[in-house]
Amino acid sequence: DNSGYGYVVVGVVSGTTLTWGTPIVFESTELRTTPLQVAFDPNTAGSFVIVFQLSSTLVQTVIANTLSGSTLGSFGTAVAFQTTYAANSSSASNKLGFDPNTAGKFALTNVLIAPSPGDSGVVIGTVSGTTVAFAGSAENWDTSDDYPYSNVVWNPNVANEIVVSYIKVGWWAKVVKGTVSGTTVSWGTPSTVNSGHSDYFNLDFDPNTANSFAWAFFNGGTGLGASGAGTLVGSTWTFGSNQTVPTGGSGTTFTIKFDPNQAGKLAVINRGSNGVNFVGSCTAGSVSGTTLTWGSANELTANGDIGGGQQPVALSFSATDTGKFVSVYALGTAGGNELGGVVCQLEASITNLTATNLLGIASAAILD
């Protein structure tokens, strides 16, 4: 919509069919097109928040609501974190993460814009109904210059443990573990995943395999996507070797997620070049120890280039249907500036997606 307002739309999946409802305004002020994130509380049915950034203030803001079936409730009051902290860059796709073991508790990454630009931290917040509250001040993991490209995930197998993946000045990809006690975060020592030019750094834990995680990022040194698997045991990080992500390319974005219904299975969604256009692709993979193996990439659409923002693709796995996930994409001018989605299916015994299990394309709201 040309107004620049914030909209939310509910999609319903039936088999391989994705049907969209009517877009609803949640913020009638101009927003930055990125970053935007919707996050559901895994411990409270229907409870979710939206993270957004006002164009006028550049401050990270959170609003809560509930979803019953396909019906949205009334939005609560939007709450801005401290005005000295900006929202994350468009490169961050997991700005806010809910604690998988505590209802209504989340962590939110941010970067200081004044008085000391570059300080990076996490704030712990809560949701009760449609009321959002920040429980304290930001807990900084680094007081030296960082780029505001950070993501946060909770370790589902270790209580009160979070991991932040971020980009250090110099474009190094780094991770740091935090231990949460109440509203306080105690930080470990940052570790380096890649000591070269990195961007769009994204990490996820396998909820079905203790200590296991995987990552993906754009490797500026090769011009391709890079990914790998590792383990975190206590304070000890072990990183496997980086593997090339199929169809990664300049300007690409990445979201990597594990299937919550089967151990060691995951997917990556990214934007890359097929030699003609920039397209959205999805690739199935598997992890064994610190070894990550990818199948063949599959394009999300046949409509040509995908654009409309720095984060044109995102994915979410079904909590109940093994291997099923939805990817949302934005088509550029070749596709009529539309938003759309596709229902995808991983097969438990394969690492590739084919014409028989990449199904259900549906287009939706017009962007402009």
Q: Locations of the language-model features?
A:
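Short loop/turn motifs that cap or connect beta-strands within the blades
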Residues: 22-32, 77-88, 137-145, 190-197, ...
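Extracellular glycan-recognition modules
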Residues: 116
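Short, surface-exposed tryptophan/glycine-enriched loops
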Residues: 320
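Beta-strand initiation motifs
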Residues: 15-22, 68-77, 129-137, 182-189, ...
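Primarily extracellular surface-attachment and macromolecule-engagement regions
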Residues: 20, 73-75, 84, 239, ...
